[in-house]
Design a protein with these regions (language model features):
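Short S/T/G/P-rich N-terminal loop/turn motif that feeds into the first structured element of a domain
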Residues: 1-49, 55-69, 76, 80-97
Length: 97
């Protein structure tokens, strides 16, 4: 499994909730071919994390520019910085009940 990891840091923590509502209303992960799951986490009042898991590297690479484009608009709207990384899920340390 291949992942895109988005680390988000808000300059104003009060915008995180508003940003998440915007994302829930305007972002449709079902349009991404090969997307297995998308998870979002609150880490601290001003930090969040999103993880997109794809079935293969080709599908991950295909949607990387779409996610970067959405993130750029999101950064401008909600006064935050998004750092994007890619990685591979370790099947030996991946557990899903």
């Amino acid at each position: 499994m291949f992942c895109i990891i988005c680390s988000v840091r808000y300059s104003n923590p009060k915008l995180m909730h508003v940003g998440h509502q915007y994302m829930a209303d305007n972002f449709d992960p079902k349009t991404f071919t090969g997307l297995i799951e998308f998870k979002s986490f609150h880490i601290t009042p001003d930090k969040g994390l999103g993880i997109f898991t794809f079935n293969n590297q080709t599908n991950m690479q295909k949607h990387l520019s779409d996610i970067k484009s959405f993130n750029k608009d999101y950064e401008d709207r909600f006064s935050c910085k998004i750092t994007l990384d890619t990685g591979i899920a370790n099947p030996d340390l991946y557990y899903k009940a």
